[in-house]
Protein backbone atom coordinates (compact mmCIF):
# COMPACT_ATOMS: atom_id res chain seq x y z
CA UNK A 1 0.00 0.00 0.00
CA UNK A 2 1.11 3.55 -0.63
CA UNK A 3 2.29 5.29 2.52
CA UNK A 4 2.18 8.91 3.71
CA UNK A 5 5.65 10.44 4.12
CA UNK A 6 5.71 13.61 6.21
CA UNK A 7 7.90 13.41 9.35
CA UNK A 8 11.72 13.01 9.29
CA UNK A 9 11.56 9.29 10.05
CA UNK A 10 9.05 8.77 7.28
CA UNK A 11 11.26 10.69 4.86
CA UNK A 12 14.13 8.34 5.67
CA UNK A 13 11.84 5.35 5.18
CA UNK A 14 10.78 6.74 1.80
CA UNK A 15 14.41 7.07 0.74
CA UNK A 16 15.22 3.61 2.05
CA UNK A 17 12.42 2.04 0.03
CA UNK A 18 13.53 3.96 -3.04
CA UNK A 19 17.16 2.88 -2.72
CA UNK A 20 16.15 -0.73 -2.12
CA UNK A 21 14.08 -0.70 -5.29
CA UNK A 22 16.96 0.87 -7.24
CA UNK A 23 19.23 -1.96 -6.08
CA UNK A 24 16.57 -4.48 -7.07
CA UNK A 25 16.31 -3.05 -10.58
CA UNK A 26 20.09 -2.99 -10.96
CA UNK A 27 20.31 -6.65 -9.94
CA UNK A 28 17.58 -7.46 -12.48
CA UNK A 29 19.53 -5.70 -15.21
CA UNK A 30 22.65 -7.65 -14.28
CA UNK A 31 20.88 -10.95 -14.96
CA UNK A 32 21.57 -13.14 -17.99
CA UNK A 33 18.39 -11.84 -19.63
CA UNK A 34 19.83 -8.37 -20.16
CA UNK A 35 23.52 -9.03 -20.64
CA UNK A 36 23.37 -7.70 -24.23
CA UNK A 37 21.12 -4.71 -23.49
CA UNK A 38 22.46 -1.15 -23.44
CA UNK A 39 20.53 1.54 -21.60
CA UNK A 40 21.34 5.28 -21.70
CA UNK A 41 19.55 5.76 -18.36
CA UNK A 42 20.02 4.47 -14.82
CA UNK A 43 18.04 2.26 -12.47
CA UNK A 44 17.42 5.39 -10.41
CA UNK A 45 15.74 7.01 -13.43
CA UNK A 46 13.46 3.99 -13.79
CA UNK A 47 12.40 3.81 -10.14
CA UNK A 48 11.73 7.55 -10.08
CA UNK A 49 9.17 7.00 -12.87
CA UNK A 50 7.37 4.24 -10.97
CA UNK A 51 4.52 4.66 -8.54
CA UNK A 52 4.43 3.28 -5.01
CA UNK A 53 1.85 0.62 -5.83
CA UNK A 54 3.66 -2.37 -7.30
CA UNK A 55 1.87 -4.12 -10.13
CA UNK A 56 2.44 -7.37 -11.96
CA UNK A 57 1.40 -8.33 -15.48
CA UNK A 58 0.44 -11.73 -16.86
CA UNK A 59 2.18 -10.85 -20.12
CA UNK A 60 5.50 -10.82 -18.27
CA UNK A 61 5.28 -14.56 -17.63
CA UNK A 62 4.72 -15.14 -21.33
CA UNK A 63 7.58 -12.78 -22.19
CA UNK A 64 9.90 -14.94 -20.10
CA UNK A 65 8.48 -18.01 -21.82
CA UNK A 66 9.06 -16.44 -25.24
CA UNK A 67 12.65 -15.60 -24.33
CA UNK A 68 13.32 -19.20 -23.27
CA UNK A 69 11.65 -20.53 -26.42
CA UNK A 70 13.62 -18.33 -28.81
CA UNK A 71 16.95 -18.79 -27.03
CA UNK A 72 16.44 -22.56 -27.23
CA UNK A 73 15.75 -22.29 -30.96
CA UNK A 74 18.78 -20.05 -31.38
CA UNK A 75 21.02 -22.55 -29.58
CA UNK A 76 19.66 -25.43 -31.67
CA UNK A 77 19.80 -23.62 -35.02
CA UNK A 78 16.03 -23.95 -35.37
CA UNK A 79 13.19 -21.44 -35.50
CA UNK A 80 9.87 -20.68 -33.89
CA UNK A 81 7.56 -20.52 -36.90
CA UNK A 82 4.17 -18.83 -36.74
CA UNK A 83 1.76 -16.58 -38.64
CA UNK A 84 -0.65 -13.73 -38.07
CA UNK A 85 -3.74 -14.80 -36.10
CA UNK A 86 -7.07 -13.15 -36.88
CA UNK A 87 -9.35 -14.38 -34.11
CA UNK A 88 -9.82 -16.78 -31.16
CA UNK A 89 -10.60 -19.70 -33.47
CA UNK A 90 -7.28 -19.34 -35.24
CA UNK A 91 -5.27 -18.73 -32.08
CA UNK A 92 -6.63 -21.88 -30.41
CA UNK A 93 -6.02 -24.02 -33.49
CA UNK A 94 -2.47 -22.63 -33.80
CA UNK A 95 -1.75 -23.48 -30.16
CA UNK A 96 -1.79 -27.19 -30.97
CA UNK A 97 1.04 -26.93 -33.47
CA UNK A 98 3.05 -23.70 -33.05
CA UNK A 99 5.00 -22.18 -30.17
CA UNK A 100 4.38 -18.45 -30.74
CA UNK A 101 1.62 -16.21 -32.11
CA UNK A 102 1.90 -13.12 -34.29
CA UNK A 103 -0.53 -10.17 -34.38
CA UNK A 104 -0.23 -8.20 -37.61
CA UNK A 105 -0.96 -4.50 -37.99
CA UNK A 106 -1.87 -5.14 -41.64
CA UNK A 107 -4.50 -7.68 -40.62
CA UNK A 108 -5.87 -5.34 -37.96
CA UNK A 109 -5.94 -2.42 -40.39
CA UNK A 110 -7.94 -4.43 -42.91
CA UNK A 111 -10.20 -6.41 -40.58
CA UNK A 112 -10.35 -5.08 -37.01
CA UNK A 113 -9.73 -1.40 -36.23
CA UNK A 114 -11.22 0.23 -33.15
CA UNK A 115 -13.24 2.54 -35.42
CA UNK A 116 -14.40 -0.43 -37.54
CA UNK A 117 -13.13 1.48 -40.60
CA UNK A 118 -11.01 -0.90 -42.73
CA UNK A 119 -8.16 0.15 -44.97
CA UNK A 120 -4.63 -0.67 -46.15
CA UNK A 121 -1.61 -0.87 -43.86
CA UNK A 122 -0.78 2.83 -43.51
CA UNK A 123 -0.79 2.83 -39.67
CA UNK A 124 -3.54 5.46 -39.76
CA UNK A 125 -5.86 3.51 -37.48
CA UNK A 126 -6.22 4.43 -33.77
CA UNK A 127 -3.10 3.39 -31.89
CA UNK A 128 -5.01 1.08 -29.55
CA UNK A 129 -6.15 -1.06 -32.51
CA UNK A 130 -3.41 -3.69 -32.35
CA UNK A 131 -3.26 -3.76 -28.51
CA UNK A 132 -7.02 -4.40 -28.52
CA UNK A 133 -6.57 -7.33 -30.90
CA UNK A 134 -3.81 -8.66 -28.64
CA UNK A 135 -6.21 -8.48 -25.70
CA UNK A 136 -8.91 -10.21 -27.76
CA UNK A 137 -6.58 -13.13 -28.46
CA UNK A 138 -4.96 -13.15 -25.01
CA UNK A 139 -8.34 -13.36 -23.29
CA UNK A 140 -9.23 -16.25 -25.60
CA UNK A 141 -5.98 -18.03 -24.76
CA UNK A 142 -6.63 -17.71 -21.05
CA UNK A 143 -10.24 -18.79 -21.42
CA UNK A 144 -9.41 -21.94 -23.36
CA UNK A 145 -6.67 -22.71 -20.86
CA UNK A 146 -9.23 -22.49 -18.01
CA UNK A 147 -11.73 -24.52 -19.99
CA UNK A 148 -9.19 -27.25 -20.64
CA UNK A 149 -8.20 -27.41 -16.99
CA UNK A 150 -11.81 -27.82 -15.90
CA UNK A 151 -12.32 -30.57 -18.47
CA UNK A 152 -9.17 -32.45 -17.50
CA UNK A 153 -9.84 -32.24 -13.78
CA UNK A 154 -13.24 -33.81 -14.46
CA UNK A 155 -11.49 -36.89 -15.93
CA UNK A 156 -9.90 -39.88 -14.32
CA UNK A 157 -6.12 -40.19 -14.41
CA UNK A 158 -6.45 -42.80 -17.14
CA UNK A 159 -8.59 -40.48 -19.26
CA UNK A 160 -6.12 -37.62 -18.79
CA UNK A 161 -3.26 -39.89 -19.84
CA UNK A 162 -5.09 -40.64 -23.09
CA UNK A 163 -6.02 -37.02 -23.72
CA UNK A 164 -3.46 -34.71 -25.37
CA UNK A 165 -2.70 -31.57 -23.39
CA UNK A 166 -2.69 -28.32 -25.38
CA UNK A 167 -0.62 -25.36 -24.22
CA UNK A 168 -2.96 -22.52 -25.16
CA UNK A 169 -0.74 -19.88 -23.56
CA UNK A 170 1.58 -19.33 -26.50
CA UNK A 171 3.44 -15.97 -26.37
CA UNK A 172 2.15 -13.20 -28.63
CA UNK A 173 4.44 -10.88 -30.58
CA UNK A 174 2.59 -7.80 -31.82
CA UNK A 175 3.04 -5.14 -34.49
CA UNK A 176 3.92 -1.76 -32.96
CA UNK A 177 4.36 -0.13 -36.38
CA UNK A 178 6.59 2.95 -35.92
CA UNK A 179 5.62 3.59 -32.32
CA UNK A 180 2.76 5.85 -33.48
CA UNK A 181 4.47 9.21 -33.07
CA UNK A 182 6.93 10.81 -30.68
CA UNK A 183 8.50 9.41 -27.54
CA UNK A 184 5.42 9.75 -25.35
CA UNK A 185 3.24 8.02 -27.96
CA UNK A 186 5.67 5.10 -28.10
CA UNK A 187 5.77 4.88 -24.30
CA UNK A 188 1.98 4.79 -24.04
CA UNK A 189 1.66 2.28 -26.88
CA UNK A 190 4.12 -0.09 -25.19
CA UNK A 191 2.28 0.28 -21.89
CA UNK A 192 -0.92 -0.78 -23.64
CA UNK A 193 0.76 -3.81 -25.19
CA UNK A 194 2.03 -5.03 -21.81
CA UNK A 195 -1.37 -4.51 -20.19
CA UNK A 196 -3.19 -6.25 -23.06
CA UNK A 197 -1.01 -9.38 -23.10
CA UNK A 198 1.84 -8.99 -25.60
CA UNK A 199 5.03 -10.92 -24.84
CA UNK A 200 6.93 -9.07 -27.57
CA UNK A 201 6.54 -5.94 -29.70
CA UNK A 202 8.23 -4.92 -32.96
CA UNK A 203 8.89 -1.33 -33.97
CA UNK A 204 10.13 -0.30 -37.42
CA UNK A 205 12.35 2.52 -38.65
CA UNK A 206 9.91 4.18 -41.05
CA UNK A 207 8.56 7.68 -40.57
CA UNK A 208 5.33 7.56 -38.56
CA UNK A 209 3.80 10.20 -40.84
CA UNK A 210 4.32 8.26 -44.07
CA UNK A 211 4.41 4.67 -42.70
CA UNK A 212 3.43 1.96 -45.17
CA UNK A 213 3.36 -1.81 -45.35
CA UNK A 214 6.94 -3.01 -45.78
CA UNK A 215 6.12 -4.30 -49.25
CA UNK A 216 4.63 -1.07 -50.59
CA UNK A 217 6.53 1.65 -52.44
CA UNK A 218 7.26 5.11 -51.04
CA UNK A 219 8.74 4.07 -47.70
CA UNK A 220 10.49 6.87 -45.81
CA UNK A 221 13.10 6.00 -43.19
CA UNK A 222 13.86 8.03 -40.10
CA UNK A 223 17.44 8.68 -39.06
CA UNK A 224 19.16 5.84 -37.21
CA UNK A 225 19.34 7.97 -34.07
CA UNK A 226 15.60 8.66 -34.14
CA UNK A 227 14.75 4.98 -34.30
CA UNK A 228 17.16 4.24 -31.48
CA UNK A 229 15.22 6.80 -29.44
CA UNK A 230 12.03 4.82 -30.15
CA UNK A 231 13.68 1.60 -28.99
CA UNK A 232 15.01 3.28 -25.86
CA UNK A 233 11.55 4.69 -25.13
CA UNK A 234 10.02 1.22 -25.46
CA UNK A 235 12.68 -0.38 -23.25
CA UNK A 236 12.29 2.36 -20.65
CA UNK A 237 8.54 1.74 -20.46
CA UNK A 238 9.09 -2.00 -20.08
CA UNK A 239 11.61 -1.30 -17.30
CA UNK A 240 9.24 1.05 -15.52
CA UNK A 241 6.59 -1.69 -15.59
CA UNK A 242 9.15 -4.28 -14.46
CA UNK A 243 8.57 -6.59 -17.42
CA UNK A 244 10.83 -8.54 -19.77
CA UNK A 245 8.77 -7.94 -22.92
CA UNK A 246 10.88 -8.72 -25.98
CA UNK A 247 11.70 -5.81 -28.25
CA UNK A 248 12.06 -6.46 -31.98
CA UNK A 249 13.77 -3.77 -34.07
CA UNK A 250 12.73 -3.86 -37.70
CA UNK A 251 14.51 -2.03 -40.50
CA UNK A 252 13.05 -1.28 -43.93
CA UNK A 253 16.42 -0.04 -45.24
CA UNK A 254 16.85 -2.84 -47.79
CA UNK A 255 14.19 -1.44 -50.14
CA UNK A 256 13.53 2.12 -48.89
CA UNK A 257 14.20 4.97 -51.30
CA UNK A 258 13.66 8.01 -49.08
CA UNK A 259 14.90 9.21 -45.69
CA UNK A 260 13.45 11.95 -43.52
CA UNK A 261 16.71 13.74 -42.69
CA UNK A 262 20.49 13.59 -42.96
CA UNK A 263 21.09 14.35 -39.29
CA UNK A 264 22.76 11.00 -38.52
CA UNK A 265 26.19 10.52 -40.08
CA UNK A 266 25.68 6.75 -40.19
CA UNK A 267 23.09 7.33 -42.92
CA UNK A 268 25.27 9.60 -45.08
CA UNK A 269 26.88 6.95 -47.28
CA UNK A 270 23.45 5.80 -48.52
CA UNK A 271 21.97 9.22 -49.36
CA UNK A 272 21.82 10.07 -53.06
CA UNK A 273 22.98 13.33 -54.58
CA UNK A 274 23.01 15.01 -57.98
CA UNK A 275 26.28 14.61 -59.92
CA UNK A 276 25.30 16.54 -63.06
CA UNK A 277 26.74 20.07 -62.66
CA UNK A 278 24.25 21.39 -65.23
CA UNK A 279 21.59 21.17 -62.51
CA UNK A 280 23.54 23.32 -60.06
CA UNK A 281 21.06 25.61 -58.30
CA UNK A 282 18.05 23.92 -59.95
CA UNK A 283 16.38 21.92 -57.20
CA UNK A 284 13.62 19.45 -58.03
CA UNK A 285 11.29 20.81 -55.34
CA UNK A 286 11.55 24.34 -56.75
CA UNK A 287 10.97 23.09 -60.29
CA UNK A 288 7.83 21.21 -59.23
CA UNK A 289 6.52 24.16 -57.21
CA UNK A 290 6.97 26.40 -60.25
CA UNK A 291 5.16 23.88 -62.42
CA UNK A 292 2.22 23.74 -60.03
CA UNK A 293 2.07 27.54 -59.92
CA UNK A 294 1.89 27.51 -63.71
CA UNK A 295 -1.05 25.11 -63.67
CA UNK A 296 0.67 21.78 -64.27
CA UNK A 297 -0.99 18.76 -62.65
CA UNK A 298 -0.74 14.99 -62.40
CA UNK A 299 0.95 13.42 -65.41
CA UNK A 300 2.67 16.69 -66.38
CA UNK A 301 4.30 17.05 -62.97
CA UNK A 302 5.31 13.38 -63.02
CA UNK A 303 6.91 13.84 -66.43
CA UNK A 304 8.77 16.90 -65.13
CA UNK A 305 10.12 14.92 -62.18
CA UNK A 306 11.05 11.91 -64.34
CA UNK A 307 12.95 14.10 -66.81
CA UNK A 308 14.81 15.92 -64.03
CA UNK A 309 15.81 12.68 -62.32
CA UNK A 310 17.02 11.23 -65.62
CA UNK A 311 19.38 14.21 -66.01
CA UNK A 312 20.46 14.28 -62.36
CA UNK A 313 22.69 11.17 -62.49
CA UNK A 314 21.95 10.36 -58.85
CA UNK A 315 24.70 8.59 -56.92
CA UNK A 316 25.81 8.20 -53.35
CA UNK A 317 28.92 10.18 -52.48
CA UNK A 318 31.10 7.02 -52.33
CA UNK A 319 29.85 6.07 -55.81
CA UNK A 320 30.62 9.58 -57.04
CA UNK A 321 34.21 9.30 -55.78
CA UNK A 322 34.73 5.82 -57.23
CA UNK A 323 33.43 6.91 -60.63
CA UNK A 324 35.76 9.92 -60.52
CA UNK A 325 38.71 7.61 -59.82
CA UNK A 326 37.72 5.34 -62.72
CA UNK A 327 37.60 8.37 -65.05
CA UNK A 328 40.93 9.85 -63.92
CA UNK A 329 43.56 10.60 -66.53
CA UNK A 330 45.96 8.04 -65.08
CA UNK A 331 47.23 4.53 -65.66
CA UNK A 332 45.32 1.48 -64.49
CA UNK A 333 47.81 0.77 -61.69
CA UNK A 334 47.42 4.30 -60.34
CA UNK A 335 43.63 4.06 -60.55
CA UNK A 336 43.74 0.76 -58.71
CA UNK A 337 45.96 2.27 -56.01
CA UNK A 338 43.61 5.23 -55.56
CA UNK A 339 40.58 2.95 -55.45
CA UNK A 340 42.17 0.77 -52.76
CA UNK A 341 43.12 3.87 -50.78
CA UNK A 342 39.53 5.12 -50.93
CA UNK A 343 38.05 1.75 -49.99
CA UNK A 344 40.46 1.29 -47.08
CA UNK A 345 39.38 4.61 -45.62
CA UNK A 346 35.66 4.43 -46.37
CA UNK A 347 34.35 0.85 -46.30
CA UNK A 348 30.65 0.86 -45.49
CA UNK A 349 31.09 -0.50 -41.97
CA UNK A 350 33.16 2.58 -41.02
CA UNK A 351 30.05 4.76 -41.50
CA UNK A 352 32.03 7.89 -42.38
CA UNK A 353 30.12 11.14 -42.59
CA UNK A 354 29.83 13.02 -45.87
CA UNK A 355 32.20 15.66 -44.49
CA UNK A 356 34.82 13.02 -43.65
CA UNK A 357 34.41 11.43 -47.08
CA UNK A 358 34.79 14.80 -48.79
CA UNK A 359 37.98 15.47 -46.79
CA UNK A 360 39.49 12.13 -47.86
CA UNK A 361 38.53 12.77 -51.49
CA UNK A 362 40.18 16.20 -51.32
CA UNK A 363 43.40 14.66 -50.00
CA UNK A 364 43.35 12.27 -52.96
CA UNK A 365 43.22 15.21 -55.37
CA UNK A 366 39.46 15.02 -56.08
CA UNK A 367 38.67 18.53 -54.87
CA UNK A 368 36.15 19.71 -57.42
CA UNK A 369 33.65 16.84 -57.39
CA UNK A 370 30.11 18.07 -57.92
CA UNK A 371 27.70 16.25 -55.62
CA UNK A 372 24.62 17.78 -53.99
CA UNK A 373 22.15 15.88 -51.81
CA UNK A 374 19.77 18.82 -51.36
CA UNK A 375 18.90 19.31 -55.03
CA UNK A 376 16.96 16.02 -55.44
CA UNK A 377 14.93 16.36 -52.24
CA UNK A 378 11.24 15.63 -52.70
CA UNK A 379 8.42 18.15 -52.46
CA UNK A 380 7.93 16.94 -48.88
CA UNK A 381 11.60 17.60 -48.10
CA UNK A 382 12.79 13.99 -47.96
CA UNK A 383 16.27 12.97 -49.08
CA UNK A 384 16.79 10.26 -51.70
CA UNK A 385 18.10 7.03 -50.21
CA UNK A 386 19.75 4.01 -51.81
CA UNK A 387 18.36 1.02 -49.98
CA UNK A 388 20.44 -2.14 -49.75
CA UNK A 389 21.33 -5.05 -47.52
CA UNK A 390 24.42 -3.06 -46.48
CA UNK A 391 22.18 -0.21 -45.31
CA UNK A 392 20.12 -2.73 -43.34
CA UNK A 393 23.27 -4.20 -41.78
CA UNK A 394 24.43 -0.77 -40.62
CA UNK A 395 21.05 -0.20 -39.01
CA UNK A 396 20.86 -3.70 -37.56
CA UNK A 397 24.23 -3.18 -35.89
CA UNK A 398 23.14 0.18 -34.50
CA UNK A 399 19.82 -1.17 -33.19
CA UNK A 400 21.16 -4.42 -31.69
CA UNK A 401 22.29 -3.01 -28.32
CA UNK A 402 18.80 -1.62 -27.76
CA UNK A 403 16.70 -4.59 -28.96
CA UNK A 404 16.39 -8.33 -28.39
CA UNK A 405 15.71 -9.33 -32.01
CA UNK A 406 16.64 -7.70 -35.33
CA UNK A 407 14.43 -7.99 -38.42
CA UNK A 408 15.29 -6.86 -41.95
CA UNK A 409 12.24 -6.46 -44.17
CA UNK A 410 13.04 -7.76 -47.67
CA UNK A 411 11.54 -7.54 -51.15
CA UNK A 412 11.94 -11.24 -51.94
CA UNK A 413 12.90 -14.51 -50.22
CA UNK A 414 16.60 -14.47 -51.02
CA UNK A 415 18.96 -16.79 -49.14
CA UNK A 416 22.01 -14.78 -50.22
CA UNK A 417 20.49 -11.61 -48.76
CA UNK A 418 19.65 -13.44 -45.54
CA UNK A 419 23.22 -14.69 -45.33
CA UNK A 420 24.72 -11.25 -45.94
CA UNK A 421 22.48 -9.64 -43.33
CA UNK A 422 23.05 -12.33 -40.70
CA UNK A 423 26.81 -12.33 -41.19
CA UNK A 424 26.96 -8.53 -41.26
CA UNK A 425 25.03 -8.03 -38.03
CA UNK A 426 26.48 -11.00 -36.19
CA UNK A 427 30.05 -9.99 -37.00
CA UNK A 428 29.55 -7.28 -34.38
CA UNK A 429 26.74 -8.80 -32.30
CA UNK A 430 27.21 -12.59 -32.46
CA UNK A 431 24.54 -13.40 -29.86
CA UNK A 432 21.74 -11.25 -31.25
CA UNK A 433 18.59 -13.06 -32.38
CA UNK A 434 17.22 -12.47 -35.89
CA UNK A 435 13.67 -12.54 -37.29
CA UNK A 436 12.40 -13.08 -40.83
CA UNK A 437 9.08 -12.24 -42.48
CA UNK A 438 8.04 -15.15 -44.72
CA UNK A 439 5.81 -12.68 -46.46
CA UNK A 440 2.73 -13.58 -48.51
CA UNK A 441 3.55 -10.41 -50.45
CA UNK A 442 6.27 -12.49 -52.13
CA UNK A 443 5.18 -14.51 -55.14
CA UNK A 444 6.91 -17.62 -53.87
CA UNK A 445 6.28 -19.53 -57.10
CA UNK A 446 8.18 -16.80 -58.97
CA UNK A 447 11.12 -16.89 -56.56
CA UNK A 448 13.01 -19.50 -58.58
CA UNK A 449 12.86 -22.00 -55.73
CA UNK A 450 11.82 -25.60 -56.17
CA UNK A 451 9.21 -27.10 -53.85
CA UNK A 452 12.01 -28.76 -51.94
CA UNK A 453 13.85 -25.46 -51.51
CA UNK A 454 10.64 -23.82 -50.27
CA UNK A 455 10.18 -26.61 -47.74
CA UNK A 456 13.76 -26.19 -46.54
CA UNK A 457 13.79 -22.37 -46.50
CA UNK A 458 12.77 -22.01 -42.84
CA UNK A 459 15.31 -24.48 -41.40
CA UNK A 460 17.98 -23.23 -43.77
CA UNK A 461 17.85 -19.59 -42.65
CA UNK A 462 17.25 -20.72 -39.06
CA UNK A 463 20.80 -22.04 -39.13
CA UNK A 464 21.92 -18.49 -39.95
CA UNK A 465 20.33 -17.26 -36.73
CA UNK A 466 16.78 -16.37 -37.84
CA UNK A 467 15.16 -18.03 -34.82
CA UNK A 468 11.75 -16.35 -35.15
CA UNK A 469 10.04 -16.66 -38.55
CA UNK A 470 6.48 -15.75 -39.42
CA UNK A 471 3.96 -15.35 -42.23
CA UNK A 472 2.49 -11.97 -41.36
CA UNK A 473 -0.87 -12.53 -43.07
CA UNK A 474 -1.14 -16.31 -42.85
CA UNK A 475 -4.45 -16.16 -40.97
CA UNK A 476 -5.91 -13.63 -43.39
CA UNK A 477 -5.09 -15.65 -46.51
CA UNK A 478 -6.16 -18.97 -44.98
CA UNK A 479 -9.47 -17.41 -43.92
CA UNK A 480 -10.07 -15.94 -47.38
CA UNK A 481 -9.23 -19.18 -49.19
CA UNK A 482 -11.49 -21.37 -47.05
CA UNK A 483 -14.45 -18.98 -47.14
CA UNK A 484 -14.19 -18.21 -50.86
CA UNK A 485 -13.99 -21.85 -51.93
CA UNK A 486 -16.65 -22.97 -49.46
CA UNK A 487 -19.08 -20.16 -50.38
CA UNK A 488 -18.73 -21.00 -54.07
CA UNK A 489 -19.36 -24.69 -53.45
CA UNK A 490 -22.19 -24.01 -51.00
CA UNK A 491 -23.96 -21.81 -53.55
CA UNK A 492 -23.81 -24.73 -55.99
CA UNK A 493 -24.32 -27.83 -53.84
CA UNK A 494 -25.99 -26.61 -50.67
CA UNK A 495 -25.62 -28.70 -47.50
CA UNK A 496 -23.58 -31.40 -49.19
CA UNK A 497 -20.83 -28.82 -49.68
CA UNK A 498 -20.85 -28.04 -45.94
CA UNK A 499 -20.89 -31.67 -44.89
CA UNK A 500 -18.14 -32.72 -47.29
CA UNK A 501 -15.87 -29.68 -47.04
CA UNK A 502 -16.34 -28.74 -43.39
CA UNK A 503 -18.04 -31.21 -41.07
CA UNK A 504 -16.42 -34.41 -42.34
CA UNK A 505 -13.02 -32.71 -42.60
CA UNK A 506 -13.31 -31.48 -39.00
CA UNK A 507 -14.10 -35.03 -37.91
CA UNK A 508 -11.36 -36.57 -40.04
CA UNK A 509 -8.69 -34.17 -38.75
CA UNK A 510 -9.81 -34.09 -35.13
CA UNK A 511 -10.66 -30.39 -35.18
CA UNK A 512 -12.38 -29.60 -31.89
CA UNK A 513 -14.76 -27.04 -33.40
CA UNK A 514 -16.77 -30.02 -34.70
CA UNK A 515 -18.39 -29.93 -31.26
CA UNK A 516 -18.62 -26.16 -31.30
CA UNK A 517 -20.76 -25.81 -28.16
CA UNK A 518 -18.12 -27.62 -26.16
CA UNK A 519 -15.35 -25.64 -27.88
CA UNK A 520 -17.06 -22.40 -26.90
CA UNK A 521 -17.15 -23.47 -23.25
CA UNK A 522 -20.74 -24.50 -22.62
CA UNK A 523 -19.56 -27.33 -20.35
CA UNK A 524 -17.30 -24.92 -18.49
CA UNK A 525 -20.13 -22.55 -17.64
CA UNK A 526 -22.42 -25.43 -16.80
CA UNK A 527 -19.86 -26.18 -14.09
CA UNK A 528 -20.35 -22.64 -12.79
CA UNK A 529 -24.14 -23.05 -12.76
CA UNK A 530 -23.98 -26.36 -10.95
CA UNK A 531 -21.39 -25.10 -8.47
CA UNK A 532 -23.56 -22.11 -7.57
CA UNK A 533 -26.69 -24.27 -7.28
CA UNK A 534 -25.27 -27.06 -5.19
CA UNK A 535 -24.22 -29.41 -7.98
CA UNK A 536 -27.36 -29.52 -10.11
CA UNK A 537 -29.01 -27.16 -12.61
CA UNK A 538 -32.11 -27.68 -14.70
CA UNK A 539 -30.93 -24.95 -17.10
CA UNK A 540 -27.48 -26.37 -17.92
CA UNK A 541 -26.63 -25.65 -21.56
CA UNK A 542 -25.24 -29.10 -22.23
CA UNK A 543 -28.04 -31.02 -20.56
CA UNK A 544 -30.62 -33.31 -22.08
CA UNK A 545 -31.74 -32.09 -25.50
CA UNK A 546 -28.52 -30.46 -26.67
CA UNK A 547 -28.00 -31.39 -30.32
CA UNK A 548 -24.28 -31.89 -29.81
CA UNK A 549 -25.17 -35.31 -28.36
CA UNK A 550 -25.40 -36.41 -31.99
CA UNK A 551 -21.60 -36.24 -32.23
CA UNK A 552 -20.88 -38.41 -29.21
CA UNK A 553 -21.69 -41.81 -30.62
CA UNK A 554 -20.32 -43.78 -33.54
CA UNK A 555 -22.61 -44.99 -36.28
CA UNK A 556 -22.32 -45.79 -39.97
CA UNK A 557 -23.99 -44.47 -43.05
CA UNK A 558 -24.63 -47.25 -45.61
CA UNK A 559 -23.80 -46.55 -49.23
CA UNK A 560 -21.23 -43.85 -48.62
CA UNK A 561 -19.11 -42.84 -51.61
CA UNK A 562 -15.90 -43.82 -49.82
CA UNK A 563 -16.84 -47.27 -48.51
CA UNK A 564 -15.03 -49.40 -46.05
CA UNK A 565 -14.83 -53.16 -46.31
CA UNK A 566 -18.40 -53.52 -45.10
CA UNK A 567 -19.74 -51.00 -47.62
CA UNK A 568 -20.31 -48.28 -45.06
CA UNK A 569 -18.52 -45.21 -43.71
CA UNK A 570 -17.97 -44.09 -40.13
CA UNK A 571 -19.41 -40.58 -39.97
CA UNK A 572 -19.17 -39.75 -36.27
CA UNK A 573 -16.95 -40.76 -33.42
CA UNK A 574 -17.08 -40.26 -29.72
CA UNK A 575 -14.89 -37.31 -28.73
CA UNK A 576 -14.05 -36.13 -25.28
UniProtKB/Swiss-Prot annotation:
The active site is at residue 213. CDD domains: ICL_PEPM. GO terms for biological process: glyoxylate cycle; tricarboxylic acid cycle. It catalyses: D-threo-isocitrate = glyoxylate + succinate. Mg(2+) binds at residue 175. Substrate binds at residues 104-106, 214-215, 250, 437-441, 472. InterPro entries: ICL/PEPM, Isocitrate_lyase, Isocitrate_lyase_ph_CS, Pyrv/PenolPyrv_kinase-like_dom, Pyrv_kinase-like_dom_sf. GO terms for molecular function: isocitrate lyase activity; metal ion binding. A motif (Microbody targeting signal) lies at residues 574-576. Pfam families: ICL (PF00463). It is found in: Glyoxysome. Pathway: Carbohydrate metabolism; glyoxylate cycle; (S)-malate from isocitrate: step 1/2. Its cofactor is Mg(2+). Homotetramer. Belongs to the isocitrate lyase/PEP mutase superfamily. Isocitrate lyase family. PANTHER family: BIFUNCTIONAL GLYOXYLATE CYCLE PROTEIN, ISOCITRATE LYASE/MALATE SYNTHASE. Involved in storage lipid mobilization during the growth of higher plant seedling. This is Isocitrate lyase. It comes from Ricinus communis (Castor bean).
